[in-house]
Every structure is written in C-alpha cells, then in structure tokens.
C-alpha cells in the first residue's frame, strides 16, 4: 500500500510539474494566489472551512479551461483530520486528484483581457472519485490590466457527496469522530488567478 501511494504521488507530482496548458495555453494558474475552499457542516449547526493547497490549471486560446486539484493537499488545520479526509473520504491512493473542465466563450476572455468585468454561466464538468457530473456555475472574470485574469465563483457551488460516491466516506468520518451527523451537501467557493503563459 505504501509503495502504491508513493507511485501515485510520483505520477501526480510529474503531472503537476508538467506544463499544464501545453503549447496552446494562453493563461496559466498561479497556485500561490488561488484558492478552492469548502465548508463541512457537522451536527447540523457547526460549519468548518477547509481548502486545498496544491492545484494546476490553464485557460487555452480557444477558451478551454482545466483545473486539477491535488486531493492530498487538503487542509483542515488539524493534521489528523487531514489524514482522515485523505484516507476515508477521498481515498487518494486510488483517486489522487479532482478535475474541473469547462469552455469559456472567447468573447468573454477578450472583454476581460481588456480590463473588463464579465459574468458568465458555465457548465463545468467535475471529475471526482471516479465519477463525473456537470455543474452549472456562475463565474466572474476580471481582467487585472497586467495580462492576468482573476476568476471566481459569483456564488457558492453546492456539491452533493452522494453524486460522487462519497457518502460512505462521509459516514466513516462521522463515525470515527463520534459525530451525530455530517452533511452530504458541501458549499464550495473558487478564487483563481491566471497569468499570461510565457
């Protein structure tokens, strides 16, 4: 199991280090200035904010968008909870990453690149835990005047753990923590900074 985990981590590391947008990337993600946050709600009333520390992404010249999240980088501010999420919820040995793909109209990018602020409704495909689902997501794209684009969700996105076969993992987390309940509905917010590819 340890060797398999190391091999998966090596493959993921190579993917993260590779030029994520290939030759056609117009903008590449600045991981250090980007954030994907999600909220877990336990015992029906206690909310806690978590995040991911490592991801790569790009926007292509044709408006194709891809974001890959390293699930092993989950950060809950409690080390043992990080490990439980990796092992019991995400099963990162088998499913080391989540991926979002979308298509943005070139006109949206052109307007934002001129310094504009554009709101767009996008069908975003989320691939997680071996399953895929298309999510309607409202995003705001802001041109920052230096060739960079900031993209963020206009409102939180609700993801249902059951849609991705994660409900047994949620139950496992609930049991090991001795909680009465953990919600399967998870609000997610995204804030991304893309810089012009070199």
Give the residues covered by each predicted segment.
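Bacterial N-terminal signal peptides that target proteins for export
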Residues: 2-11
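Bacterial N-terminal signal peptides
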Residues: 10-19
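Extreme N-terminus of proteins, especially the signal/transit-peptide cleavage junction
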Residues: 4, 21-25
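Low-complexity, acidic/polar, glycine-enriched regions of mature
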Residues: 25-198
């Amino acid at each position: 199991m340890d060797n398999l985990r190391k091999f998966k981590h090596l493959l993921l590391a190579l993917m993260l280090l590779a030029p994520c947008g290939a030759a056609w990337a117009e903008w590449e993600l600045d991981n250090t200035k980007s954030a994907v946050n999600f909220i877990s709600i336990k015992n029906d009333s206690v909310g806690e904010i978590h995040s991911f520390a490592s991801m790569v992404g790009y926007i292509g010249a044709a408006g194709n968008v891809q974001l890959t999240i390293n699930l092993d980088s989950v950060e809950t501010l409690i080390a043992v909870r990080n490990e439980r999420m990796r092992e019991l919820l995400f099963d990162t040995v088998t499913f080391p990453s989540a991926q979002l793909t979308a298509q943005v109209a070139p006109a949206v990018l052109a307007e934002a690149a001129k310094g504009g602020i554009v709101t767009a409704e996008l069908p975003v495909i989320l691939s997680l835990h071996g399953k895929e689902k298309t999510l309607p997501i409202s995003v705001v794209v802001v041109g920052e005047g230096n060739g960079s684009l900031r993209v963020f969700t206009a409102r939180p996105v609700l993801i249902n753990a059951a849609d991705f076969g994660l409900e047994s993992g949620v139950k496992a987390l609930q049991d090991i923590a001795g909680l009465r309940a953990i919600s399967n509905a998870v609000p997610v917010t995204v804030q991304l900074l893309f810089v012009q590819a070199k």
